[in-house]
Amino acid sequence: MGARASVLSGGKLDAWEKIRLRPGGKKKYRLKHIVWASRELKRFALNPGLLETTEGCKKIIGQLQPSLQTGSEELKSLFNTIVVLYYVHQKIEVRDTKEALDKLQEEQDKHQQKTQQATADKGVSKGVSQNYPILQNLQGQMVHQSLSPRTLNAWVKVIEEKAFSPEVIPMFSALSEGATPQDLNTMLNTVGGHQAAMQMLKDTINEEAAEWDRLHPVHAGPIPPGQMREPRGSDIAGTTSTLQEQIAWMTSNPPVPVGEIYKRWIILGLNKIVRMYSPVSILDIKQGPKEPFRDYVDRFFKTLRAEQATQEVKGWMTETLLVQNANPDCKTILKALGPGATLEEMMTACQGVGGPSHKARILAEAMSKATGAAIMMQKSNFKGQRRIVKCFNCGKEGHIARNCRAPRKRGCWKCGQEGHQMKDCTERQANFLGKMWPSNKGRPGNFLQNRPEPTAPPAESFGFGEEIAPSPKQEQKDKEQVPPLISLKSLFGSDQ
């Protein structure tokens, strides 16, 4: 124990015993931890004498660190102890185990960055090309690395899922970064379907190749020794050139980027195909009455990507058509924002338009307006139709019998006879069965008594002693006109 305890002495031992096992904990490192570490090193077949120096601790750390992921808790504790002891030997102050581990990680990261930088500087000094897929090996030879099956699979999957929608073009551009004409032809040949579109693409490539030949005529005379021939349009398309020639053109000084030129031709043809597969014009993109504004904006910009126009024209379309083709609800909101509103402000302002909450709010406003108009109409109608009441007792208007000041009439208010009230009166008005109202008692009670009744006495009261006898024809006519009491003739006329 004494031999192992002599690893630290003097000021190093005092610094060791001030370091805590855990951040904020009470327990600190002691000599027993060094003794335990030396025994564990023997168990792992390592030399315990390495604990006495900084370089020895560094070697132990290098041996134990790769095994931390699969090691036991004892191995991790041993590693932590060695790291703390490593910084005590360097006289670097640490407060606890975690701080020592953080310092070690930071030190290793800096060392790794320096190593990578040195490797990169060495590669640049030797002129090694890092331009994928054309790489320069250590012998200085240009080597082509073909496209991986994963890249080709991603391209085929995009074509199968998206057909030739506008997002296919940036996907093709990303997957074909730095590719040679041979790589580009490999990508095009992997497309199984859509042969009509591929034929359109071939026609576009042939047109661009012919234009290249017209603008870059072949120089007369033989080619000087050691100089490459100039690429023709068919060479750029990869039909009359080999892979070695393509690499030589792309890496010569000055280089001829045949891969980038061919890529531009393909993208030009893809733009034509996208326009054919997206026949909808930007002028036809209009927001539906119930369509959320966000979905409308998505459709608008998806169609705008397929439009073959300059950025200035697309900006004008966005500022003008996006507001003009919105539905009335959103258009009102967008016009209130003004012409300088950003897309974020538009989408925030129109958020919820067309949704359930917006519909409920509009419906509530419409119902409140309709209800208010109906109430005002009813109030105005009631003002013009004031009910006129009539007293049953005195027959005057303006009050009812309960408030009448005239002497109370005796008997029934309906027939005038005493002995019963109006509710028990047997004299009924004409019903739907045709029961007639006595002609000598005026009009029935359900008619207004506005017709003046004759006040002259009957003819027999003059005392002439003569009776006015009706003629036989008049009597027969009266019998025919008066229907029986239980007849429906009074209701339906001569149909019965």
Swiss-Prot record:
Task: Give the location of motif PTAP/PSAP motif in residue numbers.
Answer: 454-457
Specify the superkingdom: Viruses
The ranges of region (Interaction with host CALM1) come to 8-43
Give the span(s) annotated as Dimerization/Multimerization of capsid protein p24. 277-363
Lipid attachment site numbers (N-myristoyl glycine): 2
Annotated region Interaction with host PPIA/CYPA and NUP153: the residues are 189-227
Posttranslational mods: Gag-Pol polyprotein: Specific enzymatic cleavages by the viral protease yield mature proteins.
Q: How is this protein named in the record? A: Gag polyprotein
Q: Which organism is it from?
A: Human immunodeficiency virus type 1 group M subtype F2 (isolate MP257) (HIV-1)
